[in-house]
């Protein structure tokens, strides 16, 4: 079973759309222990510096970008389960994305889709997929084939 308290999301920018915020809040209620840190929009280099200050050396870093590895929901659940409850930090860039040096620092890069999404929607999608992964590993009814 996934231990959500081992996961953290660092996201650039505020959620401005109410419907996205409501969706995020709904899933966060279902994922007690998931930490979400929001970083103010800035230049990519300033954002990178702030992110590097937040992450610790013992964390497994996953950056989100369109060039990352794609998974089905079940594959992602399995990958997370196989991480053996390691501390994992997911990083979602802002409008300009993440620096290449930050992406290179990541243990792996995740693509939610070959499509490009606004960072607000990417955050909602990631949180929903973490909830889905949790229910898949628990054998719950949320994920349907």
From Swiss-Prot:
Its EC number is 2.1.1.177. InterPro entries: Alpha/beta_knot_MTases (IPR029028), RlmH-like (IPR003742), tRNA_m1G_MTases_N (IPR029026). One of its GO terms (molecular function) is rRNA (pseudouridine-N3-)-methyltransferase activity. Keywords: Cytoplasm, Methyltransferase, rRNA processing, S-adenosyl-L-methionine, Transferase. HAMAP family: 23SrRNA_methyltr_H. Homodimer. This is Ribosomal RNA large subunit methyltransferase H. It comes from Prochlorococcus marinus (strain NATL1A). The lineage of its organism: Bacteria, Bacillati, Cyanobacteriota, Cyanophyceae, Synechococcales.
């Amino acid at each position: 079973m996934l231990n959500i308290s081992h996961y953290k999301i660092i996201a650039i920018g505020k959620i401005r759309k109410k419907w996205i915020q409501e969706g995020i809040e709904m899933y966060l209620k279902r994922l007690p222990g998931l930490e979400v840190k929001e970083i103010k929009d800035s230049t990519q280099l300033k954002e990178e510096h702030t992110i590097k200050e937040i992450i610790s050396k013992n964390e497994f870093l996953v950056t989100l970008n369109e060039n990352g590895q794609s998974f089905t929901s079940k594959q992602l659940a399995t990958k997370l389960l196989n991480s053996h409850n390691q501390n994992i930090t997911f990083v979602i860039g802002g409008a300009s994305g993440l620096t290449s040096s930050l992406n290179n620092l990541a243990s792996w890069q995740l693509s939610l889709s070959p499509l490009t999404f606004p960072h607000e929607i990417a955050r909602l999608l990631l949180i929903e997929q973490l909830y889905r992964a949790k229910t898949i590993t628990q054998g719950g009814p949320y994920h349907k084939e």
